[in-house]
C-alpha cells in the first residue's frame, strides 16, 4: 500500500472494531497516568542515537559508560522529563522479542505502585526489581 494511504476496509474490519471497543477493566487497583519511559536494547548504539537525535529531534541527557553498564546506556528526551527513551548497547545480533529492556509507567502514589506490583504478580508478570 502506498505511503500516506489509509486502508479504510482494514480499519473497519471486525478485528479492528473489536480492538477499538476494548475497554479498561473497572476494577484495576491503580491508574496509569503516563508511560514514563521505554528502554530498548540495540545492536548499533551510534546508529540508534543518530536516529533519535538527528531524525526525531531527541536530546541526549545522560550517558552511562561501559564501566557502569555493559554496552553503555544513553538517555534521551523530547520533553521536560529526564528521559523518555534510553538505549542499552552491547547486543551482538538482533534477538526476537528481546529488544525491550523495560518500560516504566507513572501512577499517582506509592500506594498505587505497590497495588500495581501485586496486580502484575497475580497476572504472572515477572518483576525484576
Regions found by a protein language model. Name each.
Residues 2-46, 100-103:
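N-terminal beta-strand motif that seeds the catalytic metal site of vicinal oxygen chelate
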Residues 21-23, 84-88:
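A short, acidic/glycine-rich surface segment
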Residues 2, 18, 42-46, 104-129:
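Vicinal oxygen chelate
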Residues 29-30, 40-84:
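Core segments of cupin and vicinal oxygen chelate
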Residues 66-68, 94-97:
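Short glycine/serine/proline-enriched coil/turn segments at secondary-structure junctions
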Residues 60-62, 86, 125-129:
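A short linear hydrophobic-aromatic micro-motif
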Residues 82, 98-100:
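Short, solvent-exposed loop/turn segments at the edges of secondary structure
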Amino acid at each position: 500500500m502506498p505511503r500516506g494511504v489509509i486502508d479504510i476496509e482494514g480499519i473497519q474490519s471486525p478485528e479492528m472494531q473489536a480492538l477499538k471497543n476494548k475497554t479498561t477493566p473497572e476494577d484495576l487497583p491503580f491508574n496509569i497516568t503516563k508511560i514514563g519511559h521505554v528502554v530498548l536494547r540495540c545492536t548499533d548504539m551510534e546508529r540508534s542515537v543518530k536516529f533519535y537525535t538527528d531524525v526525531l529531534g531527541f536530546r541526549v541527557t545522560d550517558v552511562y559508560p561501559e564501566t557502569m553498564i555493559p554496552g553503555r546506556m544513553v538517555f534521551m528526551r523530547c520533553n521536560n522529563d529526564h528521559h523518555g527513551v534510553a538505549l542499552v548497547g552491547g547486543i551482538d545480533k538482533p534477538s526476537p522479542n528481546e529488544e525491550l529492556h523495560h518500560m516504566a509507567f507513572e501512577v499517582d502514589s506509592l500506594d498505587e505502585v505497590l497495588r500495581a506490583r501485586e496486580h502484575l504478580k497475580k497476572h504472572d508478570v515477572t518483576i525484576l526489581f
